[in-house]
């Protein structure tokens, strides 16, 4: 009888959720308070749930204020949610709990789930390329899985990579953005660990820039932090989706000197991707599962990649005090690479660099022979990469008495790379490197790199209010350990068909081991005064074993102030608030660090073989006074919102000084010493960041948002400590240099200046330009009309320079004198007028254009069907026949410095045209 009464008391409650403009909110969470009964709204914002009279329904949606309604006799209800204050967004501030954005004195670029899902990017650097308004992300090649040069606020160090620290659900992951120490010599293409971080499981990305914002993150965070939060499900009925994408890939031929290069190497490719996802849960636990399979045969006759991904996220309220969060992902990726850039085996470099002659004037019969040769070489190139990656995070959140919350995080990232280069006799014969009939010159190189990172973190957050003061206190300790083990085995003198090093008559092996641990203790105090002024004081004591026993722990402080003027009651009640909705001032100072490489401070010897016996020689001279370089950043900012925050302006001025900068100047030959890294430099970066986000149209069925950003950076080496200029990249005749008074990695070479009478003055070691473009930014447009969405995103840069080395090679080979004065051609070495091969690296690139349409619930089976089309890299505008992004110079050492600035012998990122259809259940 009790069950019968309960069944009669329950009824079916329906309704819808809209915003204050009448727009349906799809995916809003509806929960009966005090129960595990919940659901989510469909695409039209509608819901249906079982409940009883007197119960309280609660509707919530990210970015909106939660609303509650008590169920009465009616069977249908409408929730109208109001947007939450834009400055109430919660930012994860280190290893602790989140803090409302309005309380922070620093800036963070945020990419949400909706923006991530609609972009077709395969790699996280591609995803962020035009969506982070204050970052420069430049893909170095169009080959699969290759690295990007990532920078914010200028180049900070001449000793390390500019790649930010990557954190996934509180766990540090491998962020190697260069070739491994023992990696294959493909000519300059570098495989990136960022390429195999799964995209489809990401809920949110926070790009945290240097200075005070990164102080709490510890070792090597001076270049910023990319913090990834993965999906873990939402309370409500289970939601399932199946999505398929199919598209075409074509080579970008905008920058080719010869159209015949594309004829020989480019061929349209096909891509396929299949995705499956499921999420749901109750107030007690939620889950999210996703799987994907991606395959493409790229835009040329060699490259191919297959990527498989499984991801799982989970939350569980174990009791009213303890909450558990977990995430796991597994990625398997296979790819093939082609030779490129700085190797004689590169077909692309051979064609574009004039190594095969002037293709435009070549006879058809000769060209047919070249086509056959290129095809034969392509079929015999065998460079394979296989990645297996497992990442796991576990987090326990425990509510202690007195408003204290404890957070414990533990997890790991394990990444294995197998890289194999098989150079056959047949390929060398096609190349012309060995005579026809040679059968004993094949070689095989196989690298296995295992990188293991363990992270543990324990912190406590306390929140309190006393009269008109609010306090958020975070204190904790962190430990992470990284182990990088590489083993390279090589065989030479073999026959074709050999796939085991054991079958080669000559075998060699080498290894590389890098292990270091980092210990950190950190704290942050955020004090709110009358809920309008917030003062931050924090710091971290950081110690890294890579720095050696002679280096003590570092203290990295931060202080900050934010003042939300518009939160005063007098401002809210004034007439100006109808136009100027929000005003926030902020200022901060913070320090971050970059450690020197392992064993850099030690005096070492190298053990070699001489006449079959062991022999010792001097190696690293050693520097017992070596310490970490410190980046000190001061920042001032202003944020304005107009017309109920429909127009938002943000401006930031920053100045960062790298103290005790790590430089490795060249020792004079007379000293008899090898080069030694030293704390002798100082680097200065200053500039400003401007951004505007405008909601131009806000109607029931129409919405138009436009965003534009502009960034200015001035980079200069302010001190060399008396050392002579030294080279950090590029080539002998024209390189990337470090010199006092110049930007870091500036271009230097011999410059020819006309005297007006047919003669020229040649000036060695002249400044040719800056590899870093000082002006850059992004643009985006997003328009929705009812169920239709259209978006465009792009980025730009101006003011830097690039060397067209392919042009220089063509000129050296006598096939291209474009723009070179007749008085110079043939009268002196081209290395005496390299300024004629140096050009502006300005560009405007549209990265993505996309359109999608949601049909909603058109059948009883599907809650929504979405179809879409996207194009990547569809339009480019540059100052010449060179791609300002790509660089064939590579990165000389593992995690080393790279300035870019050399267009040479590698393909640009391809164009893709993708159609998609998504079924939601």
Outline where the language-model segments fall.
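N-terminal periplasmic "start-of-domain" segments of outer-membrane beta-barrel proteins
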Residues: 29-46, 91-119, 145-149, 177-188, ...
């Amino acid at each position: 009888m009790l069950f019968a009464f309960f069944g009669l008391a329950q009824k079916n409650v329906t309704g819808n959720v809209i915003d204050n403009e009448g727009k349906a909110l799809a995916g809003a969470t509806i929960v009966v308070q005090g129960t595990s009964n919940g659901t989510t709204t469909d695409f039209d914002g509608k819901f249906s749930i079982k409940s009883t009279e007197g119960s309280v329904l609660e509707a919530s949606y990210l970015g909106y204020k939660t609303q509650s309604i008590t169920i009465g006799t009616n069977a249908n209800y409408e929730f109208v949610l109001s947007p939450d204050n834009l400055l109430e967004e919660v930012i994860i501030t280190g290893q602790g709990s989140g803090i409302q954005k309005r309380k922070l004195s620093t800036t963070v670029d945020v990419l949400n789930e909706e923006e991530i899902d609609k972009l077709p990017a395969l790699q996280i650097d591609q995803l962020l390329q035009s969506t982070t308004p204050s970052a420069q992300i430049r893909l170095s090649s169009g080959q699969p899985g290759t690295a990007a040069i990532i920078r914010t606020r200028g180049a900070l160090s001449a000793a390390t990579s500019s790649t930010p620290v990557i954190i996934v659900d509180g766990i540090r992951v491998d962020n190697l953005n260069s070739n491994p120490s023992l990696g294959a010599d493909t000519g300059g293409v570098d495989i990136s660990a960022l390429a195999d971080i799964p995209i489809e499981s990401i809920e949110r990305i926070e790009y945290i820039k240097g200075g005070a914002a990164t102080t709490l993150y510890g070792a090597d965070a001076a270049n910023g932090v990319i913090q990834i939060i993965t999906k873990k499900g939402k309370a409500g009925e289970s939601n399932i989706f199946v999505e398929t994408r199919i598209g075409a890939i074509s080579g970008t031929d905008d920058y080719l000197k010869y159209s015949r290069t594309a004829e020989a190497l480019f061929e349209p490719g096909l891509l396929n991707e299949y995705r499956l996802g499921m999420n749901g849960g109750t107030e007690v636990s939620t889950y999210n599962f996703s799987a994907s399979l991606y395959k493409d045969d790229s835009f040329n006759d060699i490259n191919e990649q297959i990527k498989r991904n499984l991801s799982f996220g989970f939350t569980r309220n174990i009791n009213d005090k303890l909450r558990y969060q977990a995430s796991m992902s597994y990625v398997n990726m296979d790819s093939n690479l082609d030779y490129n850039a700085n190797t004689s085996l590169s077909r692309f470099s051979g064609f574009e660099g004039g190594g095969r002659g002037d293709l435009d004037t070549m006879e058809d019969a000769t060209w047919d022979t070249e086509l056959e040769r290129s095809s034969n070489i392509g079929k015999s190139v065998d460079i394979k990469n296989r990645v297996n990656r497992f990442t796991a995070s576990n987090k326990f959140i425990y509510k202690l008495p007195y408003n204290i919350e404890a957070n414990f995080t533990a997890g790991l990232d394990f990444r294995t790379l197998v890289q194999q280069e098989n150079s056959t006799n047949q390929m060398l014969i096609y190349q012309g490197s060995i005579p026809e009939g040679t059968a004993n010159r094949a070689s095989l190189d196989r690298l296995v790199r295992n990188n293991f990172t363990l992270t543990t973190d324990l912190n406590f957050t306390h929140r309190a209010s006393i009269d008109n003061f609010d306090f958020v206190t975070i204190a904790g300790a962190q430990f992470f350990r990284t182990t990088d083990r590489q083993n390279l085995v090589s065989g030479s003198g073999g026959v074709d068909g050999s796939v085991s090093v054991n079958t080669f008559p000559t075998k060699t092996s080498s290894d590389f081991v890098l292990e270091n641990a980092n210990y950190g203790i950190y704290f942050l105090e955020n004090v709110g005064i009358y809920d309008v002024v917030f003062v931050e004081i924090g710091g971290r004591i950081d110690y890294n074993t890579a720095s050696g026993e002679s280096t003590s722990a570092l203290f990295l402080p931060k202080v900050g102030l934010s003042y939300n003027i518009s939160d005063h009651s007098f401002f809210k009640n004034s007439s100006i608030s109808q136009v100027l909705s929000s005003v926030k001032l902020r200022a901060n100072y913070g320090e971050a660090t970059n450690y020197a490489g392992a064993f850099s401070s030690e005096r070492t010897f190298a053990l070699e073989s001489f006449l079959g016996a062991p022999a010792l020689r001097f190696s690293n001279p050693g520097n017992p006074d070596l310490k970490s370089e410190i980046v000190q950043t001061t920042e001032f900012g202003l944020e304005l919102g107009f017309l109920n925050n429909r127009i938002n302006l943000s401006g930031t001025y920053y100045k960062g000084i790298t103290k005790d900068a790590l430089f490795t100047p060249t020792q004079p030959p007379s000293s008899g010493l090898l080069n030694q890294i030293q704390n002798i430099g100082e680097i200065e970066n200053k500039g400003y960041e401007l951004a505007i986000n405008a909601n131009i149209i806000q109607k029931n069925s129409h919405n138009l948002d436009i965003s534009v950003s502009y960034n200015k950076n001035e980079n200069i080496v302010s001190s060399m400590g008396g050392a002579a200029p030294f080279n950090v990249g590029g080539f002998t005749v024209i390189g990337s240099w470090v010199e006092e008074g110049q930007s870091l990695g500036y271009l230097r070479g011999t410059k020819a200046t006309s005297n007006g009478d047919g003669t020229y003055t040649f000036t060695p070691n002249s400044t040719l330009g800056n590899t870093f473009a000082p002006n850059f930014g992004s643009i985006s447009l997003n328009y929705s009309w009812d169920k239709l969405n259209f978006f465009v995103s792009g980025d730009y840069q101006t003011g830097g320079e690039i060397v067209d080395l392919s042009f220089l090679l063509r000129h050296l080979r006598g096939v291209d004198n474009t723009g070179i004065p007749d008085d110079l051609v043939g009268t002196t070495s081209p290395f005496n007028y390299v300024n004629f091969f140096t050009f502006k690296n300005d560009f405007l690139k549209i990265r993505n254009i996309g359109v999608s349409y949601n049909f909603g619930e058109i059948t009883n089976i599907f809650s929504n069907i979405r179809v879409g089309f996207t194009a990547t890299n569809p339009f480019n505008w540059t100052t010449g026949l060179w791609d300002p992004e790509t660089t064939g110079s590579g990165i000389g050492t593992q995690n080393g410095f790279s300035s870019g600035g050399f267009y040479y012998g590698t393909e640009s990122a391809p164009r893709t045209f993708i159609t998609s259809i998504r079924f939601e259940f």
